[in-house]
Design a protein with these regions (language model features):
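Glycine-rich loop(s) and the adjacent beta-strand/alpha-helix scaffold that form part
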Residues: 5-15, 20-25, 106, 205-206, ...
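Conserved redox-cofactor binding core of oxidoreductases
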Residues: 91-205, 209-213, 277-281, 288-289, ...
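A glycine-rich dinucleotide-binding beta-alpha-beta segment and adjacent secondary-structure elements
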Residues: 31-34, 47-49, 164-176, 198-199, ...
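FAD cofactor-binding and catalytic pocket of flavoenzymes
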Residues: 274-378, 382, 420-425, 433, ...
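Loop/turn elements at helix/coil->beta-strand transitions in domains of secreted/extracellular proteins
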Residues: 9-14, 100, 192-196, 226-227, ...
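A conserved FAD-binding loop/helix module that cradles the flavin
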Residues: 461-481
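Internal hydrophobic alpha-helix adjacent to the cofactor/substrate pocket in enzyme cavities
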Residues: 146, 257-259, 378-389, 474-483
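N-terminal glycine-rich phosphate/pyrophosphate-binding loop and immediately adjacent elements
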Residues: 1-109, 259-268, 273, 277-282
Length: 483
C-alpha cells in the first residue's frame, strides 16, 4: 500500500525490499493465486511455529513470504472493523485520530465495489459481497440453520450493524485471490521510474545514529542508506528487525549484546484470534459443491461477552474424507474468539536474521477466553440441531458427543484450539498518554527519527475481524498524512 501511494509522487524515490519473490502481477503460481488454496505452501511461507504454551503443542503460523505478503495466502475476507473497536482504541490508547467516523473515508478510498460490499467505487482494492447463489451448498445450509436457530441475518458485515449471519465480503474474482502484489503493484505501478522492487532480499536491521534511522543492513551485510525507513514486514518479522536494531526490551537486547537504541515494549502485546474446530461426519451426497471454501459466517456475542462486543465468529468448511467415517464425508463447524483477552509475546533468541522469532501466542491464558470458546461450541451444537443441517450430519467426531458438559469441553480446548492466523500488536500504536505504545498514530517509532512501522503489528490490540483489509485501511490513512 505505501509503495503504491508514495511512489505516485514523482518527487519521491521508493525502494521496496521484499524477502520473497516478486512475481509479475499475472503470473503468481497457484498456491498464492487460487482462492481455494488457503495457507500457501513452503516456498511462499516463513515457516514459523508457536511455542507450546498452555496448549502443550506447537501451532503452524502461516505468513506469506512473497510480494503481497499474507494477502497472497489468506482467506481473502474484506471486512471493516466495527465501531466498538475504534471506540475502545480512542479511549484506552489515546488514539483520537483512529475514531470510527474518520476511518470510514479511508475504507471508501480503498474499495472498488461492484455491488453492496462497501460504498467505495473507485478504489484500488476490488471487493465483492457474495450472494447466496455464490456460496457453496454447505454455506447456504449453514446460513439457513443459523437462521432457524434464531439468529438474525446480517445487514452487511461492512455496515455499522454487522451482526448476524450471511455471506462474506471477499477480495476475490473468478476464483482468484487478489493479493496486493496484483492489485496495488500492477504493471503500470511497477513501471514507475521512481519505484524499485528488490525481491528475495532479507533485511537484518535498521541502522540508527544519534537517534535517527540512516538506512538498513541486509542479511548479507550490504548497507542501503535512505532518508526514511518504513518497516512493513508483518507482526512476526517487524518486531524482530526492531530488536536486532537495538529497539525493544532492554533485557532482551542486553542478553544478546545488542546496543540499546530505544528501550520500548516491542513484542509484549501479541494477540491473535483463537479458533476451536468441531468435526462432524456428513452424508456424502449432502456435501454438494464445496467451492468456494470460505463463504459465510455468523457473527454473534457469546454468553460471556462484555462491553457490548460481539466476540464470536462461527463458520464451516469441508474436509477431505479420511475414510474413517461411515457417512462418507467430514466437515468442520468452528468458532473463533475475535475479542480475546489472552496476550502473548514475541522475542528473539539470536542476532541471526535467518533465525525464527520465539512466538508465544498466549492462547487460553485468560480463563474468560476459555468460557467464551466453550460458548462457541454450544452455539455450534445448537446450529447443527437445526434444519437443514440436522438431516445432513451424522456423528460429532470432535470434541465428541461424550463431552456434553462445559467442564469437559473446556478440558478439551488445549488439544483442539488453532490460530485463526490474525496476529497483531507486537509493535502497538498509542497516543502520548499510552505508556505501552511503541509507535504513534502515523507509525513513528518512539525515540527514533525517520523510522516507521506500518503493518498489522501496530494495531493497539487485535481487531474483531480478519486483519488484512483493515490493515490496508491503516496504511492508507498513514499514506494520506504523509502526502
Amino acid at each position: 500500500m505505501l509503495a503504491y501511494r508514495l511512489s505516485a509522487d514523482p518527487s519521491r524515490r521508493v525502494l521496496l525490499i521484499e524477502a520473497g519473490k516478486a512475481y509479475p502481477p499475472n503470473t503468481y503460481p497457484d498456491p498464492v493465486r487460487r482462492q481455494d488454496l488457503v495457507g500457501g505452501d513452503p516456498q511462499h511461507d516463513w515457516g514459523f511455529y508457536s511455542e507450546p504454551g498452555v496448549l502443550g503443542r506447537r501451532l503452524q503460523l502461516n505468513r506469506g513470504k512473497v510480494l503481497g505478503g499474507s494477502s497472497a495466502i489468506n482467506g481473502a475476507v474484506a471486512m471493516r472493523v466495527p465501531k466498538y473497536d475504534h471506540d475502545r482504541w480512542t479511549k484506552a490508547h489515546d488514539l483520537d485520530a483512529l475514531n470510527w467516523q474518520s476511518s470510514q473515508a479511508f475504507y471508501r478510498s480503498l474499495e472498488r465495489t461492484s455491488g453492496t460490499g462497501g460504498d467505495g467505487r473507485d478504489g484500488c482494492v476490488p471487493i465483492h459481497q457474495l450472494g447466496d447463489e455464490e456460496v457453496s451448498d454447505q454455506h447456504r445450509d449453514f446460513i439457513a440453520s443459523a437462521l432457524a436457530a434464531g439468529y438474525q441475518r446480517t445487514s452487511g458485515f461492512t455496515t455499522g450493524q454487522p451482526l448476524g449471519v450471511g455471506p462474506y465480503v471477499m477480495n476475490t474474482r473468478m476464483g482468484v485471490r487478489l493479493n496486493t502484489g496484483m492489485t496495488l503493484l500492477g504493471d503500470a505501478v511497477r513501471a514507475r521510474p521512481n519505484l524499485t522492487i528488490r525481491d528475495e532480499t532479507l533485511v537484518d536491521a535498521v541502522l540508527v545514529e544519534h537517534g535517527q534511522a540512516q538506512g538498513v543492513r541486509l542479511a548479507g551485510g550490504a548497507i542501503i542508506l535512505a532518508g526514511e525507513i518504513i518497516l512493513s514486514a508483518g507482526t512476526y518479522v517487524s518486531p524482530a528487525i526492531l530488536m536486532r536494531s537495538g529497539i525493544g526490551p532492554s533485557e532482551v537486547l542486553r542478553g544478546l549484546d545488542i546496543p540499546i537504541v530505544s528501550e520500548l515494549p516491542v513484542g509484549r502485546r501479541l494477540q491473535d484470534h483463537p479458533m476451536v474446530p468441531t468435526v462432524w461426519s456428513i452424508r456424502k451426497e449432502a456435501v454438494g459443491l464445496p467451492y468456494p471454501p470460505i463463504g459465510a459466517m455468523l457473527w454473534t456475542a457469546s454468553n460471556h461477552a462484555t462491553n457490548g462486543e460481539a466476540d464470536l465468529n462461527i463458520s464451516t468448511a469441508t474436509l477431505p474424507d479420511d475414510g474413517q467415517t461411515s457417512d462418507g464425508a467430514i466437515f468442520l463447524l468452528f468458532a473463533a474468539l475475535v475479542r480475546p483477552r489472552s496476550v502473548g509475546s514475541l522475542t528473539i533468541a539470536s542476532r541471526d536474521p535467518y533465525a525464527a522469532p520465539i512466538i508465544d501466542l498466549g492462547f487460553l491464558t485468560d480463563s474468560g477466553d476459555r468460557e467464551r470458546l466453550v460458548d462457541g461450541v454450544e452455539v455450534i451444537r445448537n446450529i447443527a440441531r437445526q434444519q437443514p443441517f440436522a438431516d445432513m450430519v451424522g456423528a460429532e467426531l470432535a470434541p465428541g458427543a461424550a463431552k456434553s458438559d462445559r467442564a469437559s469441553i473446556n478440558a478439551a480446548l488445549a488439544t483442539s484450539v488453532q490460530s485463526y492466523q490474525h496476529p497483531t500488536s507486537t509493535v502497538p500504536m498509542g497516543g502520548p498518554r499510552d505508556a505501552g505504545a511503541v509507535v504513534d498514530i502515523d507509525g513513528h517509532v518512539r525515540g527514533v527519527k525517520s523510522l516507521r512501522v506500518v503493518d498489522a503489528s501496530i494495531w493497539p490490540d487485535v481487531p474483531s475481524v480478519a486483519t488484512a483489509f483493515p490493515t490496508m485501511m491503516l496504511a492508507e490513512s498513514i499514506a494520506a498524512r504523509m502526502a
